[in-house]
Structures are given as structure tokens and as C-alpha cells.
């Protein structure tokens, strides 16, 4: 995996639809050892100092410590959720309301009762199976509802939305100053 080889310590797999398409995701991150049951071998990459730590115990430990997250965002993934979260090596799950709403014929309706119920189902199932759920929020005030459900991991904002908000606010302030002069 290029991300792991670049030194990234966590991977989010998006769009799994069925157990068949998802069953090998975490094994691609884990070391190819009898204990980890992974398929990630050694190579000349940044995560191993290009040569110095190739195949070392530290290399294996780093792969074992990497966080493997799965984005559940299709109707078929929600229907197969328990089996998908039972795949060895999955550490975290995140629900994707935008893609999910499209997959059930409700594009853009992230707050539709069916979408909200699917998200709750993902959170409850993850907690029951010992998988950490993660929620996407835009602002800290959105966290309380998730904390009440047992969620303690969050993705707050996205790089493009953070930049857009900054440019809109700061650019607007500059525009006002230029207009006043």
C-alpha cells in the first residue's frame, strides 16, 4: 500500500459494498506474518527508512499498530454490516451519509429518517462488536449527539471546507476594507 509505505499510520477504506470486496482490505495493511495474517511485505519505502528497517520487528509493529478504518456508505454495506465489521483487523468504522443517501434513492437528504437510522445502526453495531465508530462533524457543537451514542472519534471539517470558510471570512473582511477605502 502506497499510503502505508509513505509513512501514513492510518487508512480509511471507502466504498466497500459487500464482504467479498472488503474481506482483504485490512490484510493489505498488516504485516505478512503468521500472527497478523496480513499480506503487506517489505519494500524500499519511506516507512522503513528505504533500507535500514526492512522487515524488522519495528516494521512489523508499525503495520500492526496502523489504524484500519472502513467507510460504510452504501446500502449493501449497511445490509452486510456485521459481517463486514467482523473482518480481522478492522479498527474503526465511519458512516457516510452523502453516498448512503444516494444509494437508497434519497440524494442530498442526509437528515432523512432512513439515513439517520442507518447511521445509528452502524454506530450501535460497531460498539457491540468492539469496533470504534467515528463521526463526521463540521463544528464541535455537533459532537454531543454522537458522544451520547458512545462515539469518541471524530473527523471535524475537511481541508477544502476549512479553507473555503477561511477564505470566505477573511476574503470578505478584506473586500469590506477595500470597499471602504
Residue ranges of model-derived segments:
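Expand to "…catalyze enediolate/carbanion chemistry for C-C bond making/breaking, isomerization
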Residues: 1-181
Amino acid at each position: 500500500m502506497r499510503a502505508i509505505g509513505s509513512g501514513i499510520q492510518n487508512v480509511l477504506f471507502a466504498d466497500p459494498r459487500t464482504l467479498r470486496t472488503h474481506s482483504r482490505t485490512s490484510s493489505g495493511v498488516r504485516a505478512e506474518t503468521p500472527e497478523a495474517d496480513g499480506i503487506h511485505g517489505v519494500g524500499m519505502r519511506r516507512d522503513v527508512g528505504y533500507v535500514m528497517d526492512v522487515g524488522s520487528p519495528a516494521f512489523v509493529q508499525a503495520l500492526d499498530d496502523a489504524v484500519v478504518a472502513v467507510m460504510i456508505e452504501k446500502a449493501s454495506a449497511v445490509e452486510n454490516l456485521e459481517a463486514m465489521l467482523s473482518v480481522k483487523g478492522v479498527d474503526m468504522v465511519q458512516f457516510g451519509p452523502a453516498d448512503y443517501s444516494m444509494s437508497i434513492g434519497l440524494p442530498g437528504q442526509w437528515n432523512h429518517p432512513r439515513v439517520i437510522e442507518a447511521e445509528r445502526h452502524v454506530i450501535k453495531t460497531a460498539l457491540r462488536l468492539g469496533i470504534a465508530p467515528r463521526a463526521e462533524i463540521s463544528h464541535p457543537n455537533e459532537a454531543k449527539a454522537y458522544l451520547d451514542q458512545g462515539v469518541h472519534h471524530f473527523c471535524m471539517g475537511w481541508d477544502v471546507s476549512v479553507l473555503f470558510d477561511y477564505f470566505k471570512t477573511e476574503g470578505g473582511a478584506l473586500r469590506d476594507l477595500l470597499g471602504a477605502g
